[in-house]
Amino acid sequence: MVRYKQTMEILKIMRNLEQVRNIGITAHVDHGKTTLSDSLLAAAGIISEKIAGEALALDYLDVEQRRGITVKSANISLYHEYKGKPYVINLIDTPGHVDFSAKTTRAMRVIDGAILVVDAVEGVMTQTEMYLRAALEERVRPVLFINKVDRLIKELRLSPQEIQQRFVQIIKEVNQLIAMYADKEFKTKWQLDPAKGQVAFGSARDRWGFTVPMAKQKGIKFSDIVDLYKKGKEALPELQKLAPLHEAVLDMVVKFIPNPREAQKYRLPKIWHGDLNSEIGKAMLETDPNGPLVMLVNDVRIDPHAGLVATGRVFSGTLRAGEEVWLVNARMKQKVLQVSLYMGPYRELADEIVAGNIAAVLGLDKARAGETVVAVEYKDMMTPFEKLRMISEPVVTVAIEPKNPRDLPKLIDALHKLSIEDPSLVVRINEETGEYLLSGMGPLHIEIALTFLKENYGLDVIASQPIIVYRESIRDKSRVFEGKSPNKHNKLYISVEPLDEKTISLIHDGIITEDMDPKQRAKVLREEAGWPTDQARRIWAIDENINVFVDLTTGVQHLREVKDTIIQGFRLAMREGPLAMEPVRGVKVILHDAIIHEDPAHRGPGQIYPAVRNAIYAGMLTAKPTLLEPIQKLDIKAPMEYLGNITTIITKKRGKILQVLQQGAVARIIAEIPVAETFDLAEQLRGATAGKAIWGQEFSRWAPVPDSMLLDLVRKIRERKGLKPEPPRPEDFIGF
């Protein structure tokens, strides 16, 4: 009955926003996020006390239990009492492995605070910094939990003094990151002060923890904890009673994480660029339960019994079953069939969920992560939420086919569902070879997806060796080329040139988008990237790989009628470039003039697409074409004596050492290395450091492949795709 009673209690408290907190737990892989979540669940009576710390209740996929890492973000609503008052804490546990970082960035959008978990032994690592930065960019307030303190006592046998020094170092590093990445008004305000209780220390596995004020109040001395560990395992219950972990962490959350009404006031201007003085804007700023319904979807799951479940935060209004809503991005109406809240893998039904809370919804089967849901009558007044920025990009691909050809329809269906749940997995069909291509953030991401296909859909698949995804680009301007339609009745005059770095970063960061107000976009491009006025005003399209189509024509007859076809032709040409049929990145395509046939029958897609493609391809092949390869940033920590070995490995793999820092007897090496060179990196690093290196990696940027390797690489990619090894020449597309 505990769960039922709690659900009823929780639904009641959810109406009073002062008693609600929306938080996430985020950390580097293996620093103990999910174990912390479990200890919090045990305290809320959702899993038994005995198995907490080992249960990994939020890791409810078998894959996660076995690997001991979180793959998806899981949600739960917890009940907690602080100073005699009940609170609801909506908790999201997010993945820490870099291959799953897209899930973490999506979770940041719907929470107001984050518990940053740092391993006391490993300290601040790459992903710690990456996720803290993502949180601060979304104006999510951090608190800190320093975990695995038991390892400092038992394994490293540090004295209380040394342990304290370790704590001071970690807090200092986290505060430096807050000062570096937080918006101006929060740089000082959000600095963490252990004396105030903004940092908790403890062991999630052994389920104890304390903050400085709590230790003072209860008379706990650190030497008491060290003494209890000397007594061995049987002393743990005493320690758990003395310093209950959930009390330390959840009291800290209630005290320092703002409630949804407070948080939306300063978070909304950052994540929503609509008119804050409009009816919708005011309702969201006030988190008004009686305002127009607005919900932001941050996650979708396929439930084998119920179909698609969309999870998200209600920013204003009240979400009720049976109501019709408008999906802004999908541009369609759908009906809310069921509203519920999450208790780990369970969904508990609710009649309604009010603004400021996290809800799970059935019925919105066309919703995807990032969708803005609004009451139907406001559909024409709603500006969608800002696009979510992903930390990584899909850089590794495998070709897959079912072992049994009869399973092909089943595989297509499973891949479709998988790409809905995880938008950072990209599924494509190679039209020429009929292969299904699955692209992900890294080898582990792909591996988990394949395991998922086998275990959830019973599909045995054959997968190729992982292939690196490249991008095609150019380094020079081309002259204007004439692209003719096959029937010779339509002619398009097109040139190409590389986009400058500033424009690329404006598009990548979501500051410039295809569907923003053209005048506003032109202003930003002129002022920030130095675009000429005529070009800045006349952008027709921006595709997902950061290519831009500009129309500089004047007075061309019938051009309006074929505009959409030309844009579609541009998108198709950018999907597969001329050099190796890899996606194109960072190219500006300019239409200078055109002759279009007056009869619609002579200017259909079959005529316009080839004209667009041929002119673009010829232009690219004369503009110093190249391939870009994905580069990863590495952050390695190892004992000082292995520095030489690590440097040798990185330089052999075409890597570059960016920085070497000495932290006591430990060297921290920041480096960059091409993804193509990382497949056996883990084994090599372990071998060269006797297993003592710890490291994290994240996607850094795209960089041109060295000229000495370019032609050979192009030939290899073309051969793999069943194309002629030699790249085409401009005259293959345009009659000179």
UniProtKB/Swiss-Prot annotation:
It comes from Staphylothermus marinus (strain ATCC 43588 / DSM 3639 / JCM 9404 / F1). The keyword Transmembrane does not apply. This is Elongation factor 2. Belongs to the TRAFAC class translation factor GTPase superfamily. Classic translation factor GTPase family. EF-G/EF-2 subfamily. Residues 18-261 form the tr-type G domain. One of its GO terms (cellular component) is cytosol. CDD domains: aeEF2_snRNP_like_IV, EF2, EF2_II, EF2_snRNP_III, Elongation_Factor_C. GTP binds at residues 27-34, 93-97, 147-150. InterPro entries: EFG_II, EFG_III/V, EFG_V-like, EFTu-like_2, G_TR_CS, P-loop_NTPase, Ribosomal_Su5_D2-typ_SF, Ribsml_uS5_D2-typ_fold_subgr. Keywords: Cytoplasm, Elongation factor, GTP-binding, Nucleotide-binding, Protein biosynthesis. Pfam families: EFG_C (PF00679), EFG_III (PF14492), EFG_IV (PF03764), GTP_EFTU (PF00009), GTP_EFTU_D2 (PF03144). Catalyzes the GTP-dependent ribosomal translocation step during translation elongation. During this step, the ribosome changes from the pre-translocational (PRE) to the post-translocational (POST) state as the newly formed A-site-bound peptidyl-tRNA and P-site-bound deacylated tRNA move to the P and E sites, respectively. Catalyzes the coordinated movement of the two tRNA molecules, the mRNA and conformational changes in the ribosome. PANTHER family: ELONGATION FACTOR-LIKE GTPASE 1, TRANSLATION ELONGATION FACTOR-RELATED. Disulfide bonds: none annotated. Gene3D superfamilies: 3.30.230.10, 3.30.70.240, Elongation Factor G (Translational Gtpase), domain 3 (3.30.70.870), P-loop containing nucleotide triphosphate hydrolases (3.40.50.300), Translation factors (2.40.30.10). SMART domains: EFG_C (SM00838), EFG_IV (SM00889).
